[in-house]
Design a protein with these regions (language model features):
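Predominantly soluble domains enriched in secretory-pathway, periplasmic, or organellar proteins
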Residues: 13-428
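N-terminal Sec-pathway targeting helices
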Residues: 1-10
């Protein structure tokens, strides 16, 4: 009898596992916004007499659309599809064994959604947008006027992630999430020209102001949330990299630095970060932490921390309740490096913090802290405002650093994440 029960349970488990894996690898039946291509307006027809105009880009990760808006009027100028090749790409990622990996990324990283535009930057000449597309594991150059893909570069592994562009606009960095490396792409050709080693799930990339260094962090396997599973999360490093040779200059286990400073915390993964212009200090968001830490780059030590408020309804949050192990995900510095903007992801607010005193103001975004889900913060080109993507409400909030007030809200697409400044030549 016991043997029959065991075999029956095993058979049931195998059947249920088979059904689960089959469903996991199925492409969702979902509609996405459609855009008409305009090859007659491709880059070669866009004369230099058409002036470059300042723009802000918001990447809407769950519908594959880039919203372009004016940084002065905050009016939407244009929307561009980040995936004019979507049928070909979806057929590719939902075929064979690749479909299981794609389903895992969709369900456990994308919260049930394919990830279609993570990060993007404009080209120097204003004719192209370079886009990291996580679920497609690639980077593409999109002609902003025609909507066509000019080049496509698959990256190593199964998922692309956070990116950066060099100050001279010639090199696009992209984290290859499952390949433990960051790859460098020549934007003129789409050719991969270099790479450097990272830890598990390479994530954030920031160039120094002079373009000589890259600040990078890997976040580990964030789908293992519990501190009891820390041994499964893998290597989580903060790195400083030579931007010319791609040699790792410094590699830091931030858990060690936290302990040395007397700050005992349950994780070590550096999430979004902000670097002062003189490169003396970095402000680091750490997995599961609701606040941030100040890291003295010159002396290689943690110097301060700021605990930001946790709403009453969030007091009993477990590590598993956090979205991809993020307490807060999004941090920026004002142009004068005096003020910090925080996207309080799990807590449903934006915090504006005086860098010297750590005094702060809170901007509440929703009654339910989990509804708004602010996900990124970027300073405006002039450094006076912060753009914060409110991913749960499909908008970008514009915050004045001095007054700590929201001065505008821009409706964008489905689940905005990265927000970037740029310049484009748009043919009307």
């Amino acid at each position: 009898m016991i043997k029959k029960i065991f075999l029956g349970t095993l058979l049931t488990g195998l059947i249920l596992s088979g059904i689960y894996l089959n469903n996991l690898g199925q492409r969702p039946d979902r509609e996405y916004p459609s855009f008409t291509l305009h090859p007659e307006t491709k880059a070669t027809t866009v004369h230099d007499s058409i002036p470059l105009q300042d723009v802000v880009l918001a990447g809407n990760n769950w519908d594959g659309v880039i919203t372009i808006f004016d940084p002065n009027t905050f009016k939407i100028i244009k929307k561009v599809s980040a995936m004019p090749d979507r049928e070909e790409r979806f057929e590719e990622i939902y075929s064979g064994l690749r479909s299981l990996a794609s389903g895992f990324i969709r369900e456990y990283i994308g919260e049930g959604n394919d990830q279609l535009v993570d990060d993007m930057f404009t080209s120097n000449d204003g004719r192209y947008i370079y886009v990291s597309r996580p679920s497609f594991a690639d980077v593409v150059a999109i002609d902003v006027n025609s909507g066509e893909i000019v080049w496509r570069t698959p990256i190593e592994g199964l998922r692309s992630d956070h990116s950066a562009i060099s100050p001279d606009g010639k090199t696009f960095l992209v984290s290859a999430s499952t390949a433990r490396k960051v790859q460098a792409i020549d934007v003129s050709t789409g050719e991969i020209i270099g790479s450097f080693e990272s830890g598990d799930q390479p994530h954030e990339n920031i160039y120094s102001e002079d373009g000589k260094k890259i600040y990078h962090a890997s976040i580990g396997k964030v789908f293992f949330a519990s501190p009891n599973l820390d041994f499964l999360k893998g290597d989580r490093w903060f790195q400083i990299v030579d931007a010319n040779t791609y040699e790792v200059i410094r590699r830091v286990d931030m858990k060690q630095k936290l302990e040395e400073a007397g700050f005992d915390w349950i994780d070590r993964a550096v999430r979004p970060m902000a670097i002062t212009k003189d490169e003396k200090f970095a402000y680091l968001q750490i997995s599961l932490f609701h606040g941030f830490f100040e890291y003295d780059i010159e002396n290689d030590k943690i110097t301060r921390k700021l605990d930001l408020p946790i709403p009453k309804t969030n007091k009993n949050l477990t590590p598993g309740d956090h979205i991809l192990a993020s307490g807060h995900h999004g941090i920026s510095l004002s142009g004068d490096d005096k003020t910090i903007c925080i996207a309080g992801t799990m807590d449903g607010y934006i915090a504006i913090v005086d860098r010297e005193t750590f005094k702060y103001s809170i901007i509440k975004l929703s009654d339910d802290p989990k509804e708004a889900k602010p996900y990124w913060a970027t300073s405006s080109k002039d450094g006076t405002k912060a753009y914060v993507s409110i991913s749960g409400l499909d908008k970008v909030s514009v915050v004045d650093y001095v007054t700590a007030k929201v001065v505008a809200e821009v409706p964008v697409g489905n689940h905005p994440q990265r927000v970037r400044n740029g310049q484009l030549r748009l043919k009307y």
